[in-house]
């Protein structure tokens, strides 16, 4: 998942991921600096292996001030995990919903979600 701010960064991450898993699900959302793609959504709710995900850049949920708006939005959408960006700092808060910021691809940081038997596992990666 690409969480906004930089189409070039998304291409770099996609190449890295495709080498590991050619069938990986790739989704993106628009960030506050993605002026080139006005049709891209600001958030998505999707199902991955029986796990419900909320994907957002995070600026509309004001994640630089607090994660509580993000937490409430993910709960409203009945999501198990909320992935967000905007701060460009890796972060993971366990619970339901789990909150995950993979960091910044330009700093060679990302998170990988694996689901087995409906149980999610998130790994923070540096490449």
Briefly describe each language-model feature range:
Residues 1-48:
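Core catalytic region of metal-dependent phosphoesterases/phosphodiesterases
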Residues 27, 94-95:
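A generic structural signal for ordered secondary structure
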Residues 7-11, 33-38, 61-66, 81-94, ...:
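Active-site environment of divalent metal-dependent phosphoester hydrolases
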Residues 45, 91, 112:
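Short, surface-exposed charged micro-motifs
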Residues 1-5, 27-32, 54-57, 80-86, ...:
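Active-site neighborhood of phospho(di)ester-bond hydrolases with catalytic His/Asp-centered motifs
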Residues 49, 72-77, 95-127:
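Binuclear metal-dependent phosphoesterase catalytic core
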Residues 39-77, 105:
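Active-site-proximal segments of metal-dependent phosphoesterases and phosphodiesterases across multiple
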């Amino acid at each position: 998942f690409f969480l906004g701010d930089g189409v070039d960064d998304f291409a770099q991450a996609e190449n890295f991921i495709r080498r590991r898993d050619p069938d990986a699900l790739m989704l993106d959302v628009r960030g506050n600096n993605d002026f080139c793609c006005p049709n891209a959504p600001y958030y998505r709710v999707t199902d991955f292996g029986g796990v419900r995900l909320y994907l957002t850049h995070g600026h509309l949920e004001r994640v630089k001030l607090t994660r509580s708006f993000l937490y409430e939005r993910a709960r409203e959408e009945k999501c198990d995990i909320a992935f967000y960006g905007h701060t460009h700092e890796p972060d993971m808060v366990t619970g339901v919903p789990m909150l995950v910021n993979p960091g910044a691809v330009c700093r060679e940081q990302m998170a990988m979600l694996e689901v087995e038997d409906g149980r999610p596992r998130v790994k923070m990666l540096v490449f």
